[in-house]
Amino acid sequence: KYTNRETAILASKYFAIDFDRKSQAAFMLFRGQKGHEDVEILLAQEFIEGHFAAKITVDSLAKKYAVGRRSFERRFKKATNNTVVEYIQRVKIEAAKRSFESSRKNIHEVMFDVGYTDTKAFRTVFKKITGVTPVEYRNKYNKQVTG
């Protein structure tokens, strides 16, 4: 009544405590871990966030920022506390969560939109990061689909 749907969902994630769960991961908000001073890694993070639907490899990122692969992986892990692959997965899953919250797209459409082509891999990564399946997440946060 006093705000929009996006703000309501955000507030529900901050204040929701679901006691039936083993994990509260579905409510976590990914902020990108940018509180570091490594310029190349910041640029790589911004590139990943802007191009998450494309196929991004560690080698291509290291080459793009003129850093050796091992050095790039080590610096990325030190700066973000995630490996490059974990970070890419988290960005993709965060985009999928936003899509589930705000659109009527089905699981396959969202999966393709965020750059996954394998349903099982998408479900596995989604559940690992959020603690719930994509269907459960969509049903909980998108009342347009269920209501």
Where are these regions (language model features)?
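Short, Lys/Arg-enriched, Trp-marked, Pro/Gly-tolerant hinge/linker segments that flank
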Residues: 3-46, 50, 63-65, 78-86, ...
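Key DNA-contact positions within bacterial/archaeal DNA-binding proteins
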Residues: 70, 119-120, 135
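Helix-turn-helix
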Residues: 62-67, 115
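Radical SAM [4Fe-4S] cluster-binding motif and immediate context
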Residues: 54, 68
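Short hydrophobic/aromatic patch on the recognition helix
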Residues: 72, 76, 121-122, 126
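Non-catalytic terminal regions of proteins
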Residues: 92, 113, 123-124, 128, ...
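Terminal helix-turn-helix DNA-binding modules in bacterial transcription factors
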Residues: 46, 55, 59, 78-118, ...
